[in-house]
Amino acid sequence: MATHKIGVIVDSFRVGVKEGIKKAQEVGAEGIQIYAVRGEMDPDNLSPSDRKELLNYIKDHGLVVSAICGDLGGHGFAIREDNKAKIEKSKRIMDLAKDLETNVVTTHIGVIPEDSNHERYKILQEACEELGEYADQVGAYFAIETGPETAVTLKNFLDSLSSSGVRVNYDPANLVMVTGDDPIQGVYTLKDYIVHTHAKDGVMVKKGDPEFIYACFAEGLPENFRLDDYFLEKPLGEGDVDFEAWIKALKDIGYKGFLTIEREVGEDPEKDIREAVEFLKKII
């Protein structure tokens, strides 16, 4: 019997939420993750009855919600003046997650510096302390996605927090593509914190500065700069993530949650996602 369940991010289909839910069922997924930051999934746009209707629609398609994506973009929580509004929005996203019967909200918080005396480190700590405390209150996890920093730097940051509500959404491809960190060893490093994962693959083309790369996501690309010169996302099994070793590591640490497929590029996402589901089913 498979240890893990397979999920998909419905937004990866690029067809809207309800159509994405249908497609998730069609490709054989057991769960879904949904972006909930704007548009039809913005918590401000979903009444209690809307939430019940959506949850019933998900259940009617034989699915559960593995997590909600609450990534608010920009520099995450790295700019203190922006954080009051972002923290309140993130709390509302956690409320929505609970209404949709999941306890995980995933996000990027910004690039955590290695130096704990860095001013940004303290700003991120303050935001995560408040969000972690709220997560504890409502029975949720606010899960930082791996990528901009090494697993060791992320672990040290998490260890510095007083709340147990801040955890990890483990994306092995982000580590491969941006920091060059070992995605297998990272599982063991972050073993006490992983509550959700993204099944994604990729390659690093050449080493770049993670600070600069994530600033490009936040602010847009400079002229004549191409992210493809630094890294490429690939279909599962075609990049540098050793998925059999990754899944073994997850089993070793006792993780029994979702492997949620994320496909952010490609001309035929439905085909790629369907093949990714089949790929994972063969190795779990």
What would you call each of these model-derived segments?
Residues 1-102, 136, 163, 192, ...:
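N-terminal pre-domain/capping segments
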Residues 6, 68, 126-240, 277:
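Acidic/histidine-rich catalytic cores of soluble enzymes
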Residues 13-14, 260-271:
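A short, acidic, flexible beta-alpha connecting loop/helix-capping segment that sits on the rim
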Residues 16-20, 57-64, 76-170, 177:
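Active-site acidic/histidine proton-transfer and metal-coordination neighborhood
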Residues 31, 104, 196, 257-258:
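Residues at the N-termini of beta-strands
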Residues 34, 107, 144, 170, ...:
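Conserved beta-strand positions
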Residues 45-53, 81-89, 115-126, 149, ...:
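Alpha-helix N-cap and loop-to-helix initiation/capping positions
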Residues 238-252:
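A short, acidic, amphipathic alpha-helical segment used as a generic capping/interface helix at domain edges
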